[in-house]
Amino acid sequence: MKGYVVCVYKSISNEEKLKEYAVKARAAVEKYNGKFLIRGGRSTSNEGNKSPRTVVIEFPSYDEANNFYNSKEYQDAHSVLDGYAERQHQTIEGA
């Protein structure tokens, strides 16, 4: 089954850092055979508070999604936003 990394941002305080993160994160996604399904874009909050940004990345398997998230490449990218974004990450196995 496929695996998905879902990141829901609660806040972003520095758009320049977000751009820097995006470049580094994209390289890690590509290395681990991921495919962006959702990367920002228009959204409507049908219930609860609206998130400023949501990202969904598909991987060939749940294990590969976890390998991506835990990789040095992605963790280096992830650290770029330390102190500049509050977010929740989940790895989810597909149906």
Spans of model-derived segments:
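Short S/T/G/P-rich N-terminal loop/turn motif that feeds into the first structured element of a domain
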Residues: 1-53, 60-66, 70, 93-95
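C-terminal structural segments of small proteins and small subunits
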Residues: 62-90
